[in-house]
């Protein structure tokens, strides 16, 4: 009998190990990447999309789009559908991979800690360097955007890599970086999307899902971003379309536009559907990626900045 008391835990541990390996294997099959580099001592991976129309003699915009927590590059490609815009407008699009299992971006943490955002900031900077060496990337037109945790990371890049990122966008962003840690060399133009019924990152702020992690009110956060970008305090309303309303902050050093999706969930407006039972409603009254690209085109880095 005593032997079974010893064997049963060992059998359970063995089964757990097998299930873990199977999960990792399945994850790798569904998480294709086609590029890698070593950054800060870590092997980092990414999924790159270069349209057939790419001309190496023409400086080409680079769009960096970042997946959410527990997601991956191929998932972000399917949700955001940036590849369609790459084909239409001749963009290079890269989907970097976060770290850990589940995958995530390090968006807050003490310097030198395991959660220090600078490790991921350095990775993105190294990635820009690598792609710029391999392709004719226009340094004045490098843009970042992301979903959820990836939206939070795009904000981190605006704070820590403002000399290289021309503008940023965020969808259902989880903004955990304290404002005291955001000191960009220039105010970055920003375009933000968020649903009022987001079950993961609450529109009015509070705890993120079941994590117990406290996040700011999104309207208040955007107001503070606009204030820091030197905008007038009172924004102007944009024309409403279906369940989407928007405001544009005026006379900014870095333009800020904020779209609110009434009853919208934790999803990418106009993009691929995510399970409604988990994320809530996905609006198709606005195409977040296309709207971002229209915004980004108006905001290249100036000659003094790149």
Q: Can you name each region flagged by the protein language model?
A:
Residues 192-194, 198:
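Short beta-strand/loop motif that positions the catalytic acidic residue
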Residues 60, 67-72, 264-265:
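Active-site glycine-rich loops that stabilize anionic/oxyanionic intermediates
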Residues 65-68, 95, 260:
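Structural cue for short, hydrophobic secondary-structure segments
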Residues 136-148:
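Alpha/beta-hydrolase fold nucleophile elbow
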Residues 68-72, 77, 101:
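Serine-hydrolase catalytic-loop signature spanning alpha/beta hydrolases and amidase-signature enzymes
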Residues 97-119:
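Cap/lid segment of the alpha/beta-hydrolase catalytic domain
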Residues 4-62, 74-80, 85-88, 116-120, ...:
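A domain-start/cap signature at the N-terminus of enzymes
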Residues 113-135, 156:
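Alpha/beta-hydrolase active-site loop
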